[in-house]
Amino acid sequence: MSGNFRFMMDQKDIVRFLTTTIDSFIQDRLINKEQRTQHKDQCAERLAAEDGNTDKETEVEYSDQAVLANLDWGIEALEEAINTYNMETKLARLDYAEKMLQVCAMLNPKQKTAGVPNSYLSAWAHLNLSYLWKLRNNIKSCIYHSLEMFIVDPFFSRIDFAPELWKNLFLPHMSSIVGWYSEERHKLMMEVLPESTDFSYTADFDKVFNESLVFSMRPNQLEKLQKLEQLYGESLDENTRLYAKYYNDCMNPDSTSSKKVVPMLPIAEPPMTPLHELSRSVPDFVKFGPILPKSSGFSMTTRRSNDGLNETTRENIASNSNHSKGEQSSLWAAKESIIEEIEDDLDSEHYDASVDSDKINIFSPEPKKNIKDEDVEPKVYRSNQKNQMNSPNISPMESPRRASNYSSTNPLRRKKESKFLRLLSNRFTGSIVSDHSLSSSPDTSSDHIFTGDEEVMVRNNIKRKNDSQTPSMNQDNENSLVLNDSSHCESEDGYQSSSSFPKLEKLTIGSKPPKDFVCPITGQIFSDPVTLETGQTYERKAIQEWLGTGNTTCPITRQALSANILPKTNYVLKRLIVSWKEQNPELAQEFSNSNTPRGSSCSPSAKDITMVSSIQRTTDSPSQKYKDDYIRQRNNRFTRVSVGASPTSVLSQAAVETIINSLTPYITSLCTSENLQDCEQAVLEIARLWKDSKTDPQIHSYLSKPTVVSGLVEILSASLNREVLRRSIYILSELIFSDERVGETLNSVDSDFDCLAMLLKNGLAEAALLIYQLRPVFAQLSEHELIPSLIQVIQNKSEDIDDFQLAIDPKAAAIAILEQILIGGDEYNRSVNASSVISANGIPAIVKYLDKTEGRRPVISILLCCMQAEKSCKSSIANRIELSPVLELFHAGNDSVRGICVEFLSELVRLNRRTSSNQTLQIIKDEGAFSTMHTFLVYLQMAPMEHQIAVASLLLQLDLLAEPRKMSIYREEAVETLIEALWQKDFSNNQMKALDALLFLIGHVTSSGKSYTEAGLLKIAGFDQPYNVLMKAEQLGHSDNDFMETMEDEKNAMKSWQKRVASVLCNHENGSIFQALEECLKSNSLKMAKSCLVLATWLTHMLFTLPDTGVRDVARKSLLEALMNVLQSSKNLEEKILASLALKSFISDPTVHEVLRVYAKSIYRILRKLKKYSTVAADILKALLNLNSVDVTELWSCKEVVELDLSSNGEVLSLHYLNGQVLSGHADGTIKVWDARKRIPRVIQETREHKKAVTSLCSSVDKLYSSSLDKTIRVWTIKPDGIKCIDVYDVKEAVYELAANAKLACYVTQGTGVKVFNWLDAPKFINFNKYVKCLAVSGDKLYCGCSGYSIQEVDLSKYTSTSFFTGTRKLLGKQTIHSLQIHDDLLFACGSSIDATAGKIFSLSSKMVVGSLSTGLDVHRVAINSDFIFAGTKFGTIEVWLKDKFTRVASIKMAGGNTKITSLASDADGMMLFVGSSDGKIQVWALD
């Protein structure tokens, strides 16, 4: 058939066509927000209509409500995703929308939910899912859901959801069906027309759809036409579904088959094959088939009754008559033409339900048949003018109507009312006026859609008018004018024909303001519109007068008003009015300053009302009664009369003129006088007169002239009289509230704002109100530095200004301006401005303002800004604030307000004292009329993503106030939200917020509001520096006198709180938080990874203080690998220490030993370097080296760094390491000081104060002691740049060995025994008949290594000696202990090798041998660090043993061959080894 040729393409072309078409359609919908909103409203209208058709007593199940709620939430979330520019928020809202929409998309289409067909809900969901996948750039899924929409419900997809898409995808395939329908309709029309009429199929084909012919049909013909339309619609739906499935198959070929099979193209077959090709003259609306009006709900069948069938069908078909022949409007334009349906303006009580039916039913060919109420459609459209003129019983200006003999407001009848399918032509509304009238106002085609009650009214009106005009069409002109006036005032649009109203011919549709801009009471354009709870909008002054007379109902709807205070001005409507006035200045002036009020264009004058009354007195016919009722109804809604006539009227014109005449001389004086006093007096008088008449538009217009405004501004800049300044601001403020153009006038001159800013700085509080009304931008406000002045306004008491009440309290205006300043600008500006508020002592006054109901939100916002910028002010706010207003604001506010409240409370509880935080939390928990925890829980489940973290954190803290012994839904939901946020890799901001919330939850908060959890953990690990720096800064920042007194309570409270937090977080869902932290540690964000590491370290540290519930295994499996990775790869010292602290917690677990073995080689060197900063690193290293499964020899590694040739100074007799420096003593008496902080030592000092060889070096605290063969002992001070000799002691004998401290010196001379010198008295000799080779001091004990392989212990307090150890004497050779070292309460004694043992290790406490060093070489020198024992031999080798296990690890061979090792020293960290030899060289080894 025609049109199918364009789809004769292969599968790739079809896919390309579908992609292009559907993608373009969805893209257009996403771009056009107004269209989406309009479409949602239309669908909601259908749902509402269906709700009105169902039995009200039927209770809707909760599950059904949930389904509808999911659909609504899904659409709202999708709309938020479309509107936001934040990619993280967009993705989150899309995920949420998908979950909600999938619920409806998967419904069974054959069932119903809450009376609504599931197919409709599912199709609607699929449409929104196609939007969703387009936003995700997944075109394939987008196409899938678009096609599923047509498969699930082709009918409503065609008429409601996507008519444009249906036209492009499916309509070209339906040409045969449309051709069949056209032929069948042609046959029916041929039966109606007279035989003489030329009405062939090929000539004037569009006349087939001229529905005026339907009025001539007989009942059986109407029934045939109805069945034809029903069959036509079913055919379109069936084939639409068929082609949608075909398209779906093309997009998704069978993947299971190895051979691709092209789907078979379906054929749209009509019930009968048409005889002709489809004529181009068939209107587009016919091709779309029957539609269902949205006001009809989902009723898809027609009530077939013998009484009402013909009239119902006639009305169903008659709606097409007003579609003109040449009209080629697009489908969407047609759809938009019926978006708005005007409400029924008339109460049913004004209608006569007993009107004679055979007088009303003037169109029925059988006048005896009545039209039942069930057959009355919600909309009836007029036939065109030509057909009306051909009817002998119809006036040229009237459209045919039919009435009901039952009241349309009867609830029983409404409940039984049937809805009918009608063609798309019903979307196009015609006019009841002539072609001339239509051409004069082409934009009003959508202004004449009636509700059912209005139709009945108009039909009755027309019938009665015809009855009164039956004798003659030439009745009295005046009476005819009145009747025409009343009969043509349709609904609220007040439409009229220019030929029918000669007296009001100027007030046509094109020359009057939109009805929504006109007050129904005053008849004038709104200047201060207020919208009541009933949805009706009135002028503020008018409705105030109405309520002031004792009325408590809405003037139009008669609904009771619950609020006693009028709402705020409807600024949205006001802005629209201002915009319209700018485009229509002359018309706006006419309707604003008209001498005669205009309620609408069809409102009768007083003369008309008089004439109607006279007619009513002479005629009692139903027609006249109806006219009287109708005119009264229109008068009540649209007209106003003089002041004395109605309590809803405003000032009479005479009173207005009197006030204007009174104002004129003062205005003249203000604008022209050069005398300041005269101008000031004029301002006072103008204010007095304006106060009583400010709502009258004419007076307002008179005072809004630019010259008057300029005069008032000049007074502000020139006058010094505060009363005059206040009155000037009062007048300008009221003018701006009524007309924003006055504010625009002031904003156009920068000096005007500067003047107001200066007045505010000079202490005029009212200036804040005017500045607020001018809506300045942040740059203007920041330029003038208004914060101190605004704080002053807030702090000062309100001054009494007599009875001149300002619209807004200056304090409220000041707070609003202050909020704008604080939230404006960049982060630096916000911080500086918030600090200015705090320094101006503004917080106490701002907190007090919370007592007022209005203005709480900006107060909370200001306080939140202050706390975020200056954390230290939290305590001040917490001590002053009452939290009840904050919670009340949370309960009553929207999502934005609730978000501010939650953020405020979350910041407020982050105090530096746990006890104070708990007290604040307890107040939050107990305050409020409702359960705070329950309210937070409900809000948590529906809060936007950006607020969920704060709510969850606050809710969890409230729950933790009590010991978490039982299951708590609050706790579970809060922790679940926080952990879920940690999993959201696509939303790094949300992850960071969750981590911050969890870290602050621990409770380590400084007085400045910073978390010091990391510093506290580093301190536990032995790295105190960050903690000490932080605490030092905090102490400088504040003084807390009673801190020490409450330290114990604070410590206990913190311990209890942290234990609760750790228990709740670790045990939630068997440690799921550790799995989430594992993912966070993989983040590319350094800040996030650091925060996650801190939290993981704290949790693992606390985990082993809690009872083991199996969570430890989960933590180990989740974090161990990640912690090892941090330890190996991180370049940050703090991170390595934190990872070490977390790893230490797992060391006791045997399963961790295997992991340590695997990583031993890679972490060994790291731990060795780290142990100088952290004690936990040393603990881990010790555990690693002591593992039986670890081969220490594989870990050992050393490298010679440098060899220093000092042979010119002779032998290197002693080496000593002290605070990053190495000191060497040489045979020529030289002492050299080396900087050993780098791998290659550097000489920083060389001194030769000893005359002979320096035999020994030792230190104590900051003193160095040296002994020499020159018979002296020298004492040196140690400085970073070298040493300085401060004392010299001549001991009269050569000193071979020295051990000294601040109290005494023990030294060895040439003879036996040892000498002890207390630096004051003569040396004491302790003789034990042995030659001493080495010394070691521990406390008040001196240990002497002697010949004969023995050790003597000397009590320095008593100067007595005892034998500590006596070795086995050998007959051959000398056995001597050459070196003693004390380390970690162990005494290491090394010397001659006896039985392959050259050293023994003793416990000083038990004096027992705890180990031995196995080697066949004699050991002359020993050096010990935390990990290893180094033993130097006389043959140039150094034996290395593991310190804790005494296991030989390696042997280091000196480069000089068999040179004797004379001295050894190791640095404190065990990373470097310094070796002195007899050939005068020092070798430096790096111990990796």
From Swiss-Prot:
Top-rank taxon: Eukaryota
Gene: LIN
Low complexity bias: start-end ranges: 432-444
InterPro entries: ARM-like (IPR011989), ARM-type_fold (IPR016024), ARM_LIN (IPR055566), ARM_LIN_2nd (IPR056514), E3_ubiquitin-ligase_LIN (IPR052858), LIN_N (IPR056512), RING-Ubox_PUB (IPR045210), Ubox_domain (IPR003613)
SUPFAM superfamilies, per database record: ARM repeat, RING/U-box, WD40 repeat-like
Start-end of Polar residues biased regions: 382-411, 468-486
Function: Putative E3 ubiquitin ligase involved in the rhizobial infection process. Plays an important role in the early steps of bacterial symbiont thread formation in roots, and in growth, differentiation and maintenance of nodules.
Induction of the gene: By rhizobial infection. Promoter activity is detected at 3 days post-inoculation (dpi) in dividing cortical cells in roots and at 6 dpi in young emerging nodules. At 21 dpi strong promoter activity is detected in mature nodules in the nodule apices including the infection zone, with lower activity detected in the nitrogen-fixing zone.
Pfam families in alphabetical order: ARM_LIN (PF23568), ARM_LIN_2nd (PF23654), ARM_LIN_C (PF23628), U-box (PF04564), WD40 (PF00400)
Compositional bias ranges of the Basic and acidic residues kind: 366-380
Record note on disruption phenotype: Defective in intermediate steps of nodule differentiation leading to a strong reduction in the number of infections, mainly arrested in the root epidermis, thus producing nodule primordia that initiate normally but fail to mature (small white bumps).
Entry protein name: Putative E3 ubiquitin-protein ligase LIN
Transmembrane domains' residue ranges: none
Any Gene Ontology biological process: nodulation
Pathway: Protein modification; protein ubiquitination
GO terms assigned for molecular function: ubiquitin-protein transferase activity
Keyword vocabulary terms for this entry: Nodulation, Repeat, Transferase, WD repeat
UniProt-listed SMART domains: Ubox, WD40
Annotated U-box domain residues: 512-587
Region ranges (Disordered): 297-330, 351-414, 432-500
